[in-house]
Regions:
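Pore-lining transmembrane helices
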Residues: 2-350
Length: 350
């Protein structure tokens, strides 16, 4: 028995299959976030830019980039796990299946299933004389089978978060602002799609405004409080891209998530009770935050389409809720935690 275990361990080592929290929780998660940024998020930014400038080509290009988010995330994970070329390329199909079948939980489904498919592909790679057939076939069949079996259930987890958010929308504005802001903001940072959840729930009005506040608190909060470690590049990639880039760091030290989450708990009720910030644009914009400024553009288009007379108070509220307060509050909370030793130098390094 002991000899058999040693034989398996030796085989895994030869195949570079390292079952560890660091490889799966840090390396794979970080790579997935980059894959998401290089497809859905940069595509959203390009598409939004095209819509605002009236450039159809940019709208089309952005749409193409966003459409391959699943394959991009899966390939990124395979690269981080040192998948062989045939296995790496085969993960493109796996990512497409997992993302589509996972619905609002697509990114999480891609993350879990791509890891398994990549590792299985590594185990069979170059073990036969027909490797060009075996490795892609095994990788794709394992990945797509797992997607068909489990991705819908993973999507149901994201839908459960959506149900919780819907319950929160029925609360009075103060509590609703806190709960919706915190939940949607956390969903944005987690490997689930906050935008898809908001779209599925039709999250607009005051609840949509609270969702925007929560997403901005996470994105701007992480971008500003990690500026010392990540500079301008980190400021832009998180502030206009996604706070999910910080997930590996959150897994290492969950306390890094406290500052932007506390900021969301404050800006949410301010948005609903003081500024009456509403999202009357597309519901999907409620879950985008500052990604390509989609959230802010959604609020603005809602103002215009509703025929609302936009006042200086409205603009001040939008700027404070989306940019100023998240930056200031997250920085203050982060500095307090740094002084307590809960957040250390390098904890937020991308």
């Amino acid at each position: 028995m002991e000899q058999a275990i040693q034989s398996v361990q030796s085989f895994f080592k030869r195949k570079d299959v390292v079952i560890s929290a660091h490889r799966y929780g840090i390396d794979a998660m970080g790579a997935m976030a980059q894959g998401l940024f290089a497809s859905l998020l940069i595509g959203t930014i390009i598409k939004t830019l095209g819509q605002q400038l009236g450039l159809a080509f940019l709208v089309t290009a952005g749409g193409y980039a966003a459409a391959v988010a699943g394959p991009a995330m899966a390939a990124s994970i395979g690269y981080a796990l040192h998948a062989p070329q045939l296995g790496l390329f085969s993960l493109i199909a796996v990512g497409g299946a997992a993302n589509e079948l996972g619905g609002a939980g697509g990114p999480l489904a891609v993350y879990l299933i791509a890891i398994i498919a990549a590792e299985v592909g590594k185990l069979v790679s170059k073990e036969t004389k027909i490797d060009i057939l075996v490795t892609p076939a095994v990788t794709i069949l394992v990945g797509v089978s797992l997607s068909a079996l489990f991705a819908p259930s993973i999507g149901a987890v994201a839908s459960a978060v959506g149900s919780l958010i819907m319950w929160a929308t029925e609360l009075q504005p103060l509590l609703m602002g806190i709960v919706v802001s915190v939940l949607v903001g956390m969903a944005l940072t987690l490997p689930i799609s906050s935008a898809a959840i908001c779209a599925a729930l039709g999250l607009t009005g005051l609840a949509g405004g609270a969702a925007v506040a929560g997403c901005c608190a996470q994105m701007v909060g992480f971008a500003v409080m990690s500026y010392k470690e990540n500079g301008v590049g980190g400021l832009v990639s998180q502030g206009l891209g996604t706070s999910m880039l910080q997930m590996p760091n959150i897994l290492r030290n969950p306390r890094t998530w406290i500052p932007p989450t506390l900021a969301a708990a404050i800006t949410g009720p301010i948005a609903t009770c003081l500024f009456h910030l509403e999202m009357n644009g597309p519901a999907v914009s409620s879950g985008m935050g500052t990604c390509g400024l989609v959230g802010q553009i959604g609020v603005y288009t809602g103002w215009i389409e509703s025929g609302k007379a936009v006042t200086a108070f409205d603009w001040i509220g939008l700027v404070l809720i989306c940019f100023v307060l998240p930056a200031v509050l997250s920085t203050i909370f982060c500095e307090v935690l740094r002084k307590k030793g809960w957040i250390k130098e390098g904890d937020l390094k991308l």
